[in-house]
Amino acid sequence: MPELPEVETIRRGLARHLVGRRIGYAEVFHPRAVRRHSGGAADFTGRLIGRRIQAVLRRGKYLWFALDSDLALLAHLGMSGQFLLADAASPSPKHLRARFAFTDGDPELRFVDQRTFGGLTLAPLIADVPASISHIAPDILDVAFDEAEFHRRFTQRRTGVKRALLDQTLISGVGNIYADEALWRARLHYATPTVDISAATCRRLLAALRAVFRAALRAGGTSFDALYVNVNGQSGFFDRSLAVYGRAGQPCRRCGTAIVREPFMNRSSFRCPACQPVPRRPHW
């Protein structure tokens, strides 16, 4: 699933090409693409015609097109959602779920989703955020992110540190890949109890998370397959710089110890046994 760096890479590409343009035509090709929109496909497309895109914004893994009249076209990419820019005359991709044309011509916007876990909906804007995601916490790159408040709520969770990082109501945009990478940089085991994390350790963890996000953004995100691409259809290449994720059996880039892969919440965690030893009181 795309995490913050991938969604932010897409957001930047969309903003460059779409801000200020007016939607002249919209079409939905698969009902699951708008299953979260209670009015259905006809209402969804009808309410978009004539709307101008004023901004393309993001919170965590969600992105939205802020439209005039305090309305947002809200998107979640799920496992395989893609926004692609293309000329109207170019061939349609295999898993095209929706398309949007503009009154000023090409390029048009296409929503492609192989697994159909992603989706689009319309939502009212409240304080510049779609009402339906107002419960999602700011992410670490958001100017509204408060480190002291995060630490206070973090230690109250009484869970393992990685579980807390994946809680989108506590901090948004963090998924399995970047949680593992940040924990490696901060030298923390994923089962370290949040109650044991001091303010100083929390600052170290957040600094590690910021650093890995910024490095991933410079690389255009992480692509393990063709399911994540930017708006031009290009893959990111941060996978070449990953320290632990997907590197089981390979040497730690810091100490040389073999990276291990362990089951975690129906997925996997990757860590260095030497740099990230099991804590005295692990919270699995």
Swiss-Prot record:
Cofactor binding description: Binds 1 zinc ion per subunit.
ZnF bounds (FPG-type): 243-277
Family of this protein: Belongs to the FPG family.
Entry cofactors: Zn(2+)
EC number: 3.2.2.23, 4.2.99.18
Name under which the protein is recorded: Formamidopyrimidine-DNA glycosylase
UniProt keyword annotations, A-Z: DNA damage, DNA repair, DNA-binding, Glycosidase, Hydrolase, Lyase, Metal-binding, Multifunctional enzyme, Zinc, Zinc-finger
One matching Pfam family: H2TH
Swiss-Prot/TrEMBL catalytic activity: Hydrolysis of DNA containing ring-opened 7-methylguanine residues, releasing 2,6-diamino-4-hydroxy-5-(N-methyl)formamidopyrimidine; 2'-deoxyribonucleotide-(2'-deoxyribose 5'-phosphate)-2'-deoxyribonucleotide-DNA = a 3'-end 2'-deoxyribonucleotide-(2,3-dehydro-2,3-deoxyribose 5'-phosphate)-DNA + a 5'-end 5'-phospho-2'-deoxyribonucleoside-DNA + H(+)
Phylogenetic placement of the source organism: Bacteria, Bacillati, Actinomycetota, Actinomycetes, Acidothermales
